[in-house]
Swiss-Prot record:
Subcellular location(s) of the protein: Cytoplasm, Cytosol; Cytoplasm; Rough endoplasmic reticulum
Protein's name according to its UniProt entry: Small ribosomal subunit protein eS21
Gene Ontology cellular-component annotations: cytosol; ribonucleoprotein complex; ribosome; rough endoplasmic reticulum
Keywords: Cytoplasm, Endoplasmic reticulum, Ribonucleoprotein, Ribosomal protein
GO biological process: translation
Record keyword NAD present: no
Family: Belongs to the eukaryotic ribosomal protein eS21 family.
Entry GO MF terms: structural constituent of ribosome
Native species: Plutella xylostella
Amino acid sequence: MQNDAGEFVDLYCPRKCSASNRLIHAKDHASVQLVIADVDPATGRAADSSKMYVVCGAIRRMGESDDCIVRLTKKDGILVKNY
C-alpha cells in the first residue's frame, strides 16, 4: 500500500514470540512486549540500546511466561547464569 507521498507502508507488521517463534496475530490481546533498557553502570542512566522480548498469549495462558523471560535474559547476558 502507498501513502499520499508515494512511499510504501504496511498496515500491519506482525510480531513473533521470542520464546516459541509463533506469529502473534492482531487479535491476540493477551500478548505482551517487554523492552529492557541497557543501563550505564557508572552513571545509572539508560543508554540508547535496549532489548525487546515478546511473549504470545498462548505461552502466558500456560503460565510459562516467567520461565521464558528468565531463559531469554540468561541467554542474552542480562541475568547471571546461576540465577
